[in-house]
Amino acid sequence: MTSHPRDAPQFYLTAPSPCPYLPGQYERKVFTHLVGRRARDLNEILTQGGFRRSQTIAYRPACETCRACISVRVIVGDFVPSASQRRVMRRNRDLVGQPQPNRPASEQYALFRRYLDARHGDGGMVDMTVLDYAMMVEDSHVETHLVVYRKRGPDTAINGRGVGAPIAICLTDVLSDGLSMVYSFYEPSEADRSLGTYMILDHIERARLLGLPYLYLGYWVEGSRKMDYKAKFGPQERLMPQGWVRVE
């Protein structure tokens, strides 16, 4: 009879469900729980192996007939922004991002709610309550924090803090080899700012300042309008059957 250490992770497989990225496809996921004293180390290993974190769950696609979801990470030290990305940075130079503990707040949920209603009204997260949001943010056994973006104020250069309501927010995990953008959302009425792109560019710079080699972006899905933007941040590495492969 095979025995397993008490704290060894147990993996499970979900039932098939409609794919949110490719019409006509069905997705399955393999997942495990990130709890206890080894949660941080396990999250490191699994992230490097193509898993993503959601609260205390680490998951990876395990679809029977499709391999379109490919983990991507930006090579921070080699990244050079394109002309359009430099314009996005200039467009948002009136913003400042402040790291803060992963504690939920009512103004965060208000922004989250506006974002979902405007951008993902037919998505699986649209029914999330304030309690669901709180769990998404604070239910974690790994090193994580929020980066909250606000407009610069008269004292920002001194205290590093912005003023007014948050314009964008990212839940970010800190790993030994990089930052991982778990979930980000932004003010839909500020669409001209390209805030999704801006937060990625800002996190690349944050990783560089921390001396971390990678920024994990999650899954790139070729042909999916929801995910195709991730290919614009290069050079990057994509997780293939033979391991991480550099793509210019």
Swiss-Prot record:
EC class: transferase
Molecular function GO labels: arginyl-tRNA--protein transferase activity; leucyl-tRNA--protein transferase activity
Keywords (A to Z) from UniProt: Acyltransferase, Cytoplasm, Transferase
A UniProt-annotated Pfam family: ATE_C
GO biological process: ubiquitin-dependent protein catabolic process via the N-end rule pathway
Region forming the signal peptide: none
InterPro entries in the cross-refs: Acyl_CoA_acyltransferase, Asp_Glu_LeuTrfase, N-end_Aminoacyl_Trfase, N-end_Aminoacyl_Trfase_C, N-end_Aminoacyl_Trfase_N
UniProt main location, coarse: cytoplasm
Reaction(s) this enzyme catalyzes, per UniProt: N-terminal L-glutamyl-[protein] + L-leucyl-tRNA(Leu) = N-terminal L-leucyl-L-glutamyl-[protein] + tRNA(Leu) + H(+); N-terminal L-aspartyl-[protein] + L-leucyl-tRNA(Leu) = N-terminal L-leucyl-L-aspartyl-[protein] + tRNA(Leu) + H(+)
Free-text function comment from the UniProt entry: Functions in the N-end rule pathway of protein degradation where it conjugates Leu from its aminoacyl-tRNA to the N-termini of proteins containing an N-terminal aspartate or glutamate.
Annotated protein name in UniProt: Aspartate/glutamate leucyltransferase
